[in-house]
């Protein structure tokens, strides 16, 4: 019996020894793999073995938090003091990303103030040094940084963070410090752990005010929202919604409710207004009627009422002058109009002038009468013409006539047959006065004995369309050193060189320029407005004229016509369409249509009764006819007297 307890004691002793040895072996193994230095809550760690930068970061993230993210100079001094020297040094948590040095843990770019590079670093040798090491206990640069290739093997310098998921109550930023952390509270929160919410306090609501609130963080606290509305018959005076700010102050004072009142009305220009008021001016149930002076028509309702919502039943009407016909765009005349009561309305006056080289046929001034008609027909501009030029004997004539015939801006060039020379101008232009710039030249027989050898001659130039040309000929027309200057009329710009010279190579110094019309901005057309444009020099260019109109039943708000001016600006802004009252024709159409429909139904019923009686007498077994209109649609009738379609 004595041997049994002894055996049991030996077994327990052996088991304890085995566990102790096992624990010592495990501790030795861990010590071989990892050495560490701790400071209370935030601890630093380093690997005993060397790894590449990527593997070092994986090592730190697996066993700790990440590679060291250095926040200040004190931390660098602490690391240099406590971490042991190692000849290949330590990796830290900085790497080049998108060509910028970045803290990999926070993905924040390294600022210049936080840099701690060694002298002449980073140098990026061989363009592949994208990772950073720290010189721990270096004699020449203790605690300094150096850029290195990421594949090199160094010890991993890790840290374990103090901040946890619930640190700072999830209402502030947790900032690591050596041995602890601090909380930087988000706006609206305060306290050591950001556990408190700023409160704004409750309201003292004025009479007739109703309030609805939401309190995501506590009653009448930061981020609380309150909306307000009034009892029926009252309107809100003040903000409709308030918010509790992070400062603990509401965005405004609570609103008040006042009795509903409609906006004050004014008599329309060229018209009058008469109102029946309630207890106070322009309050609920007030009504106002409107009328216009002679020569003006009311656009809008004759009577408006103030509703319980504090708005009138319709906008205030206006008195609009009678409309005259729009000016045609085919007159080719320059028009300058004054519109005291709107574009082309009563008392509008338009004066007409013609461009250089044309003359006006008709009245130079038109006025819109109170009848809605102009006081005279529209004038037109006709081009000035020059006398027809004969072909020179023993020569040829070539002409360019942009306006047709021998009109203004026509140009003719003259040449002689072989053995003859030109006596007179080589070119003639039709001037605005209706005369050519010179007399027609003649071709004279050349004296072959005394005739000089031909000199340098460049191709003949002509003035660009809508432009001018002025040449200085030194030896002969368009000969050597001839210089020609070009320009454009108002509303056009020159494309090319403004001056050309004839070179000994018989070529001009550049291609002949052209004149292009000044461009205006493209007009944005939105439904339902309709726009028609004439573009003599290209879409939305100088001289382009656009007219506007609205669908039937809608009124044009703005100018009915705009012109692209020589400065590249439109003469007026784009108009809009707004709903208008029924016209007399529309009213008659609807009333007439209804009357015609009723008459048609009565007539159809009588005819149907007669047909049924007739069919019964014949008793031929055929079905009675269904009533059909002449349009072929069952039950549809029209009144031709009021049908607006042709």
Curated annotation (Swiss-Prot):
It holds the Pfam family EGF. One of its GO terms (cellular component) is plasma membrane. A carbohydrate binds at residues 123, 133, 146. Ca(2+) binds at residues 121, 123-124, 146-147. Keywords: Calcium, Cell adhesion, Cell membrane, Disulfide bond, EGF-like domain, Glycoprotein, Lectin, Membrane, Metal-binding, Repeat, Signal, Sushi, Transmembrane, Transmembrane helix. It is a single-pass type I membrane protein. One of its GO terms (molecular function) is integrin binding. Glycans are attached at residues 48, 54, 80, 180, 212, 219, 336, 481, 532, 539, 557. It is found in: Cell membrane. Residues 637-646 are annotated as: Interaction with SNX17. Residues 612-646 are cytoplasmic. Stored in the alpha-granules of platelets and Weibel-Palade bodies of endothelial cells. Upon cell activation by agonists, P-selectin is transported rapidly to the cell surface. Residues 198-259, 260-321, 322-383, 384-445, 456-517, 518-579 form the Sushi domain. Disulfide bonds join 60-158, 131-150, 163-174, 168-183, 185-194, 200-244, 230-257, 262-306, 292-319, 324-368, 354-381, 386-430, 416-443, 458-502, 488-515, 520-564, 550-577. Residues 159-195 form the EGF-like domain. Residues 1-41 form the signal peptide. Residues 58-158 form the C-type lectin domain. Belongs to the selectin/LECAM family. Ca(2+)-dependent receptor for myeloid cells that binds to carbohydrates on neutrophils and monocytes. Mediates the interaction of activated endothelial cells or platelets with leukocytes. The ligand recognized is sialyl-Lewis X. Mediates rapid rolling of leukocyte rolling over vascular surfaces during the initial steps in inflammation through interaction with SELPLG. Mediates cell-cell interactions and cell adhesion via the interaction with integrin alpha-IIb/beta3 (ITGA2B:ITGB3) and integrin alpha-V/beta-3 (ITGAV:ITGB3). The C-type lectin domain is required for binding to integrins. Binding to soluble integrins alpha-V/beta-3 (ITGAV:ITGB3) and alpha-IIb/beta3 (ITGA2B:ITGB) is cation-dependent. Binds to the allosteric site (site 2) of integrins and activates them. The interaction with integrins may mediate cell-cell interactions and cell adhesion. Interacts with SNX17. Interacts with SELPLG/PSGL1 and PODXL2 and mediates neutrophil adhesion and leukocyte rolling. This interaction requires the sialyl-Lewis X epitope of SELPLG and PODXL2, and specific tyrosine sulfation on SELPLG. Interacts (via C-type lectin domain) with alpha-IIb/beta3 integrin ITGA2B:ITGB3 and alpha-V/beta-3 integrin ITGAV:ITGB3. Interacts with alpha5/beta1 integrin ITGA5:ITGB1 and alpha4/beta1 integrin ITGA4:ITGB. This is P-selectin. It comes from Bos taurus. The lineage of its organism: Eukaryota, Metazoa, Chordata, Craniata, Vertebrata.
């Amino acid at each position: 019996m004595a041997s049994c307890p002894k055996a049991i004691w030996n077994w327990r002793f052996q088991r304890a020894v085995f566990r102790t040895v096992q624990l010592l072996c495990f501790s030795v193994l861990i010590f071989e793999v990892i050495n560490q230095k701790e400071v209370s809550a935030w601890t630093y760690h380093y690997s005993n073995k060397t790894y590449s930068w990527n593997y070092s970061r994986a090592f730190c993230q697996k066993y700790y938090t990440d590679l060291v993210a250095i926040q200040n100079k004190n931390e660098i001094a602490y690391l240099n003091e406590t971490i042991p020297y190692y000849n290949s040094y330590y990796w830290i948590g900085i790497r080049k990303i998108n060509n910028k040095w970045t803290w990999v843990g926070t993905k924040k770019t390294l600022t210049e103030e936080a840099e701690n590079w060694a002298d002449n670093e980073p140098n990026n040798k061989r363009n592949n040094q994208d990772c950073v090491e720290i010189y721990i206990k270096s004699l020449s640069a203790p605690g300094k940084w150096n850029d290195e290739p990421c594949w090199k093997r160094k010890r991993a310098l890790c840290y374990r963070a103090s901040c946890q998921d619930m640190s700072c109550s999830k209402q502030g930023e947790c900032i690591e410090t050596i041995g602890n952390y601090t909380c930087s509270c988000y706006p609206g929160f305060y306290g050591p752990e950001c556990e408190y919410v700023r409160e704004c306090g409750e309201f003292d609501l004025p009479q007739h005010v109703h309030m609805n609130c939401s309190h995501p963080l506590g009653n009448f606290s930061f981020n609380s929202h309150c909306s307000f509305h009034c009892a029926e018959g009252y309107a809100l005076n003040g903000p409709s919604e308030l918010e509790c700010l992070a400062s603990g102050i509401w965005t405004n004072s609570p609103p008040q409710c006042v009795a509903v009142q409609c906006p004050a009305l004014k008599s329309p220009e060229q018209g009058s207004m008469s109102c029946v008021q309630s207890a106070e001016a322009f309050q609920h149930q007030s009504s106002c009627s409107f009328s216009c002076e002679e020569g003006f028509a009311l656009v809008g309702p004759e009577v408006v009422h103030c509703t319980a919502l504090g708005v009138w039943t319709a906008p205030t009407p206006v008195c609009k002058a009678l409309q005259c016909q729009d000016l045609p765009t085919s007159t080719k005349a320059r028009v300058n109009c004054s519109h005291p009561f709107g574009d082309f309305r009563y008392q509008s006056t338009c004066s007409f002038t013609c461009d250089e080289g044309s003359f006006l046929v008709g009245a130079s001034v038109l006025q819109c009468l109170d009848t809605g008609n102009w006081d005279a027909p529209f004038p037109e501009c006709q081009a000035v013409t020059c006398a027809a030029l004969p072909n020179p004997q023993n020569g040829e004539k070539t002409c360019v006539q942009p306006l047709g015939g021998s009109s203004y801006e026509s140009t003719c060039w003259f040449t002689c047959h072989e053995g003859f020379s030109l006596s007179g101008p080589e070119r003639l232009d039709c001037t605005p006065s209706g005369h050519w710039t010179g007399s027609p030249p003649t071709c004279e027989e050349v004296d072959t004995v005394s005739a000089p050898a031909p000199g340098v001659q460049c191709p003949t130039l002509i003035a660009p369309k809508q432009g001018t040309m002025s040449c200085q000929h030194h030896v002969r027309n368009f000969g050597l050193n001839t210089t020609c200057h070009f320009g454009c009329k108002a509303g056009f710009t020159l494309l090319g060189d403004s001056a050309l010279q004839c070179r000994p190579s018989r070529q001009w110094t550049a291609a002949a320029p052209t004149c292009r019309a000044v461009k205006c901005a493209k007009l944005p057309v939105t439904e339902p407005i309709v726009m028609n444009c004439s573009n003599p020099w290209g879409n939305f260019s100088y001289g382009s004229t656009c007219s506007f109109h609205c669908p039937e039943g809608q009124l044009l708000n703005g100018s009915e016509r705009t012109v692209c001016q020589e400065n590249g600006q439109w003469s007026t802004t784009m108009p809009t369409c707004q709903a208008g009252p029924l016209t007399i024709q529309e009213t008659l159409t609807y009333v007439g249509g209804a009357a015609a429909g009723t008459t048609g139904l009565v007539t159809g019923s009588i005819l149907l009764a007669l047909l049924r009686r007739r069919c019964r007498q014949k008793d031929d077994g055929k079905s009675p006819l269904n009533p059909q209109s002449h349009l072929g649609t069952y039950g549809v009738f029209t009144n031709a007297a009021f049908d607006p379609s042709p």
